[in-house]
Regions:
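A broad, structure-centric signal for solvent-exposed, well-ordered loop/edge residues
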Residues: 34, 39-42, 117, 133
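Short helix-coil transition sites and intra-membrane helix breaks within transmembrane domains
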Residues: 28-38, 107-114
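Structural signal for alpha-helical transmembrane segments and their flanking helix-loop junctions
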Residues: 27, 31, 39-48, 123-125
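Membrane-interfacial helix-loop-helix
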Residues: 1-23, 47-158
């Protein structure tokens, strides 16, 4: 599996793949695989400044679709995690998520907790489309702020 993923990433690193690479990397990084898509977005925009908005939108779409997959995975595992049901941490986290509802998916942009949050939202069977909307808003904001900040910190052409 590791060799396959490495070969895929090497192929996607080819410059002629541009926006499709950003989409695939953003999609994969929204699952529970440890991967960041921000460097791919920044690299593409740094090399092609005219692709700023297309890259942000494509990354948002890929990352949101990946979050939707995580939601469905969480929904499908609803019956598989009964053994953690009684822990106090689990009960507090579930109460917090149920209180916030789909709006909790605004936090899907957070590193480390955002992707599992999408899965837990599915596990809780929070409404799919509102969760998707809030995921998209959070992820769009992350890509916009992160890419604009990096371009501001590292100005000029390569």
């Amino acid at each position: 599996m590791e060799a396959w993923l490495y070969n895929l990433l090497q192929w996607l690193a080819l410059p002629e793949h541009g926006l499709s690479t950003v989409f695939v990397i953003a999609f994969i990084s929204a699952t529970l695989l440890p991967m960041g898509s921000e460097p791919a977005v920044f690299g593409l925009v740094k090399l092609n400044p005219e692709l700023f908005w297309p890259a942000i939108l494509v990354a948002t779409a890929g990352n949101t679709l990946g979050g939707m997959v995580s939601w469905w995975m969480g929904w499908g595992t609803h019956h598989a995690v009964n053994k953690w049901r009684d822990s106090s941490t689990h009960i507090r986290a579930l109460a917090w998520l149920e209180k916030l509802g789909p709006k909790a998916c605004l936090l899907s942009w957070l590193p480390g907790v955002g992707d599992p949050l999408c899965a837990v939202a599915g596990w809780l069977k929070l409404p799919f489309w509102p969760c998707t909307l809030y995921m998209a808003i959070g992820k769009f904001g992350r890509y916009l702020v992160m890419t604009a900040s990096l371009l501001w910190i590292f100005p000029g052409q390569i």
